[in-house]
Regions:
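Bacterial N-terminal signal peptides that target proteins for export
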Residues: 1-9
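C-terminal segment of classical bacterial N-terminal signal peptides
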Residues: 7-8, 14-22
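Conserved Rossmann-like nucleotide-binding pocket used by diverse enzymes
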Residues: 17, 33, 106
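Residue-level signal for beta-strand positions within conserved beta-sheet cores that form or flank
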Residues: 20, 50, 101-103
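Sequence/structural segment immediately N-terminal to covalent heme-attachment motifs in c-type
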Residues: 25-49, 54
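Sec-exported extracytoplasmic/periplasmic mature domains
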Residues: 35-45, 59, 79, 94-98, ...
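Electron-transfer interface patches adjacent to heme c in soluble/periplasmic c-type cytochromes
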Residues: 43-45, 56, 60-87, 107-117
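C-terminal capping alpha-helices of c-type cytochrome domains
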Residues: 83-128
Length: 128
């Protein structure tokens, strides 16, 4: 009986965690989180700063924004099939230099999952 309950609980947790960020997060709070990003990134297509523009980032192959010089590591990740979606972006933003060793991004990462959820909600809205 205990094993059945434990297995059921594990399955439920996995199901909830696999839902993703599509409907989670607060756009207004995500905009505040984006303040940490906007020193290096814009939301305007083709307008890059230290980092690439995030306009149209979801569904884009890593290292492929036009007119931006990406690190070899980011280009290699893209060539290996990395495409930005809510899950890959969230994993990257937790620990960028661990997720893609050799990335030029110096940001240490967001530590709180709620910050990432809110940022994903904002970016999905702002980069349509």
């Amino acid at each position: 009986m205990k094993k059945t309950l434990s297995l059921t609980a594990t399955i439920a947790i996995l199901a909830v965690s696999s839902i993703g960020y599509a409907n989670a997060g607060d756009v207004a709070k995500g905009k505040k989180v984006f303040n940490k990003c906007k020193a290096c990134h814009t939301l305007i297509a083709g307008k890059h700063r230290i980092g690439p523009s995030l306009a149209g980032v979801f569904g884009r192959t890593a290292g492929s924004a036009k007119k931006y010089k990406f690190s070899k590591a980011m280009k290699k990740a893209g060539a290996g099939g990395l495409v930005w979606d809510e899950k890959t972006m969230a994993a990257y933003l937790m620990k960028p230099r661990k997720y893609i060793k050799g990335t030029k991004m110096t940001f240490a990462g967001l530590k709180k999952p709620v910050q990432i959820e809110n940022l994903m909600a904002f970016l999905k809205e702002a980069t349509k």
